Amino acid sequence: QLAGAIKHPDTGRIQDLSEATNKEIDITDSSVLLYPCDGYGDEKLVRMLIEKEKPDAILLITDPRYFEWLFNIEDEIRTQIPITYLNIWDDLPAPMYNQEFYDSCDALFGISKQTKNINEMVLGDKVKNKVIKYIPHGLNHKKFFQLENNDKELNKFKSQFNNNGNKEFTLLFNSRNIRRKSIPDTILAWKYFLDTLSKEEREKCQLVMHTQPIDQNGTDLPAVIRFLFPEDDHNIVMSHQKLTIEQMNFLYNYADGVILLSSAEGWGLSLTESLLTGTPFIANVTGGMQDQMRFVDEKGKWFTPTPDVPSNHKKTYTECGEWALPVFPTNLSLVG
């Protein structure tokens, strides 16, 4: 695997994770090597790896624009091994400008049902020459799982956020502070919710925001909170310290619900984490978040996007899993 970073400190030093991988998944014969590199690699490095490691295929992950250098030599590579691409696309309209990228691959694996449909829409007649599959995002159920309410370590963790013991309802936001996550909308929704409650009820509610308070890719969240809650009665807790996976599992188990109102979302990992811990969620109906709501069509089957109904954001179907509270958009906008 090419282990890329902007300026990787270990460039040139191969890291062998085979033993750790064997232990993690209880096998004996894995071969997992990391080749640290700057950026996303280059033609010279890929040619060297094909010659040295003799892989059966190349698997790409992330936005195609980071691999333009690879797509420029796809004819050279595909005479030796296939190029496969585990890909995601946030939302409609279908990115027709990606057609040449998709066509440079032998197999496309869509992380969401919408992505698989978008791959097919963009390729058109060329789709018959490709392998296109839906491979939903997954997480390790040994890392995120439901805990009993009387779990000692969980209750010890709860005391960090509920030190006076009077909180009866906690809503969790866990994601990056970036524009498309619509965090100010989440804070405004929290205000509208609190406005429906009495003073005594408000004091029993809490919004935990596990994110960076200020980010150049997002906004100044403390400023938003001060603007919407000049009386400082918001009951919002900012959690910006890095937590271990075990602590994150505690956080999801502590919450009564999770909220994610992204305007565009390829998948929405915080929803998957909430599902594994048995925590219901509120989410915008867009992208891969729809998969996790499990909408049902008129035939009683799990909704699968088509060119005619490429997304359920227009409220074509309303029946979904009992764990989800869908938020259907009231308006559409082009961003870009």
What kind of feature is each model-predicted range?
Residues P280-A283, M293-R294, G300-F303:
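Short hydrophobic beta-strand element within catalytic cores of glycosyltransferases
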Residues N163-K181, I187-W190, L207:
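Conserved donor-binding/catalytic core segment of Leloir-type glycosyltransferases
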